[in-house]
Amino acid sequence: MIADLAGLIAPLSVGAFREHLAQRVPLLLRSDGDVATLLDWDSFFDAALGDDFPARRLRVTKEARQLPTVFYRHRGRVKRDAIAKVMEAGGSVIAYDLHRFVPALARLVASAEAEIGEHIVGAAIAGTGEHGALPAHYDDGDLLIIQIAGRKRWVVHADPMIDPVVGAPQVRSDAAPVPLLDTMLAPGDMLLLPAGYRHHCMVAAERSLHVGLFFYPLTAPRVLDLMMRAMFESPAARHPIRGDADMDAALEAALRQQLLERIERLSLAELRAAHRTVALPEGLA
């Protein structure tokens, strides 16, 4: 049974994994580990289609196109028969933040956060269509793909978007796609795909299930996001900045002083702790 990050990536050490994260280049890991203890087809659908699972974190696609929720939701609840029909017709179900609803994934994410010190999100995709769940795209977090069941072909392009901003719209590349990696993942295999690498994948068997762990390091924009959220709790910070033009100099000085005081109080240890626990900005792909 896989209980933590070290057990998942063995024989690669956690230290070596951390180095690969810093290098920001794709890494293929072949393994025959018992990844089915993390998730299986039934437990995926039980969690993703449950009444407690947030609707905004669930997507249903067919031929790499997202389906409107009206096709599979009624009065706030998922229509399981509609999902079954989509899957029979070559569709996919994508569940973000799935680790919050699957204990084995929750333990793995908690272990990875403790070892790596970053904000980590667990997701999974179940698919039956040869077109894949999504069109070619890049993710805004470093992604560790864990193939759970079935086989999936992954094509990674060589022209990455460098350091994409979390939640920002996708930036299109004008360059013709050049494959950097074209590989087939079987159960137990893993692929570390740094943020910004455009990719697409196709189911190579009757059905496929994979887990994705998104690693989000602390960045300057994230620090500003955390500072802004902290300022929401301060009546003084929320006070309107108003006045005539002849008051601008005094208002600017007061604003600078307020922001500088917050910056001078910054603690990297406290920021890292907040980063791991506070939700990321909306728009996570």
Question: Where do the language-model regions lie?
Answer:
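Conserved metal-binding segment of the jelly-roll/cupin
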Residues: I148, T183-A204
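A short beta-strand-loop-beta hairpin characteristic of the jelly-roll/cupin
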Residues: K152-P187
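Fe(II)/2-oxoglutarate
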Residues: M1-A10, D174-M184, H200-A285
